[in-house]
Amino acid sequence: MRAVDTNILARFYLRDDAVQGRISADVLSAGDVFVPKTVILELEWVLRYVADQPEDKVLDCLAHLIALPGITVEDRDEIEAALRHCRNGIDFADALHLAASKSCSEVLTFDDRGYARRAKKLRLKPPVQVPTAKQQIPRRTRPTDS
């Protein structure tokens, strides 16, 4: 199995370099390819903010990527959940953080206007909370060395 970096996938989807585009297509079509979730996160950023692609097109590219035969995606279920959350208005990076935190009791953020409010409206789990100065944050106690 071979892992790919973001630039291989960017060239495949953007087709902005004919030679590298063909090579990247050959790499992906050969199969036995591993895509780390950090590469998917970076690809979303490159497509949206560097290549200035609309969000729906970017999400379609990511959905296409994870559905390709011969492609193994790290934590695929988290990527799929992040895509669903993102299509409902959550920023992709935040959506991926939320999906990766599925076993936690809550996600803490200072982004009240965007992330926390949207997540609450969508009733996403774990709940996304904004900690306040008045709120008591439970502290874990460490076992003492004896």
Model regions: which residues?
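Acidic catalytic patch
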Residues: D60-R87
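Acidic, PIN/NYN-like endoribonuclease modules and their adjacent C-terminal/linker elements
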Residues: M1, L98-S146
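Short beta-strand scaffold positions
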Residues: V4, V35, V73, F92-A95, ...
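Amphipathic alpha-helical segments within well-ordered protein domains
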Residues: A25, E44, R48, A63-I66, ...
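Residues that scaffold the ATP/ADP-binding catalytic core of kinase and kinase-like folds
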Residues: R11-F12, V46, R118
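Alpha-helix capping/helix-boundary segments
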Residues: I8, V39, E78, L96-H97, ...
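Short, conserved active-site loops that position catalytic residues or coordinate cofactors/metal ions
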Residues: K37-W45
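Short, well-structured N-terminal submotif of metal-dependent ribonuclease cores
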Residues: M1-V35, V50-A63, L68, K125, ...
